[in-house]
């Protein structure tokens, strides 16, 4: 039995092998499709035979027409300090290479990204890019498709930091225009011609973007030839997009604190003139706080020569805050001057009364002698000279007393009377808010229109 069993074992294995093989084929067929036919696939080795990737299609003839299309994935960062923005885009390029045409089928062939290294590619680059890189997670983010007539679609994902010249004169009430310039690096217009794809009527993705500081209001496409004397003309395609700054965050962070500081400085107008420490400390605190706010707001901006709208508003508020402090100094000076003047009047008034009484006494004592001399002079028909001199002296002294008397008619001090300190505060309560409101109307009209 043992010998018979060993003889039958190979036969049993042969009988069972087709059954297991059919089951395996069925499992694979259920997964990949049992009716898969790839007879239409072109012979890539035959297409690439004699292919020279270092030469453009149709070299020596008409230039290659390259259609470009953009799809924006994100705009990650816009920096005013560095005048740049970071954008991630899908760049689609399409051109025809007749050397790769296969006309026996209408199927489009999707190729592995590694096949890109074997093809001729347009040398497109971003002109105003500061830095750029390709994405390679989990594989290189490149797509290439080959159509039967030799048309190649090449798509790549690029993240680039691009320069953007900004005019910050109206910051933060400004609108900026940034560009993305695409150009051939080595091929002139005699070898390659760029044009926007017919499907590029709008940039996909821009309508879904949510930027923290800006809103994209519009965009447009341009095509131009750049002239270089030493190299010729090079085609350039540009995407221009308008950015309007979102003003809400700046109103909350910069404008409203400045307005509140100015209003806080007006509180001193309702504080008594006698409360010197309170009014001085309030004025100095508002001035220093306004200075700190100005410095912190400017730290995130470039040191540009242009005066920005935010700087103008900060200086307007700074002037009003400082003027409120100066107003108290002026009012306090007037109050102190009035006190000293009243004290001086009280001292000089008794002296003036004493001088008048002394003059009356002297006049009474000399009245008898003057009368006798006057009688003698009348009999002789003349007026004594010393009497005329006395009259003139009295007249001059009277004029002096009238002109120099405090508060007298025609006096200089009567025309320059110091204003009461409380009256100055009352005027300031109305003048400062009205002037600040008028300046704000002019400011917002000038920078928002």
Curated annotation (Swiss-Prot):
Disulfide bonds join 164-178. It is found in: Cell membrane. The chain crosses the membrane at residues 252-271, 276-298, 309-331, 424-446. It catalyses: chloride(in) = chloride(out). Glycans are attached at residues 103, 106. Delta subunit of the heteropentameric ligand-gated chloride channel gated by gamma-aminobutyric acid (GABA), a major inhibitory neurotransmitter in the brain. GABA-gated chloride channels, also named GABA(A) receptors (GABAAR), consist of five subunits arranged around a central pore and contain GABA active binding site(s) located at the alpha and beta subunit interface(s). When activated by GABA, GABAARs selectively allow the flow of chloride anions across the cell membrane down their electrochemical gradient. Belongs to the ligand-gated ion channel (TC 1.A.9) family. Gamma-aminobutyric acid receptor (TC 1.A.9.5) subfamily. GABRD sub-subfamily. This is Gamma-aminobutyric acid receptor subunit delta. It comes from Mus musculus (Mouse). The gene is Gabrd.
